[in-house]
Amino acid sequence: MAGEFGKFIDDKRRGRAAGGGDILLKDIATAMGITATYLSDIVKGRRNPPEMTMLNKIAEVLHLSSQETKELYDLAGRERNEAAPDLPDYLMDKEIPHVRAALRRASEKKLGDDFWKKVFDEIDKEGKD
């Protein structure tokens, strides 16, 4: 049964081909260098979502926006029960240990989405694009 990741790919490939048709799984698979059967197994939830390089190829073939690509990463990570694949390098950067400490502290205190929304807003005020 397809999970959220597979449903996302299925939804995003509809109507995105030149002329408004659907992008075929075999075309996505070819760009990824895998068989259509293997990709079909991923989309149907019989195999885990692929790693970052392959996710980027999916995003490219489907003409995903930056926001849609981030959603693709999140869904892949969630389905693999891992952090989204674009995050580990930043999370593990030894120059910024407070990232891990803050996440652990927030987890211990069971801080929810309301807290992280405030953090997100602060990052938008302070951060660099």
Language model regions located:
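Short, charged amphipathic recognition helices of the HTH superfamily
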Residues: A18-K26, E51-L55, D86
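Amphipathic alpha-helical "recognition" segments
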Residues: A36, E51-M52, T69-D89
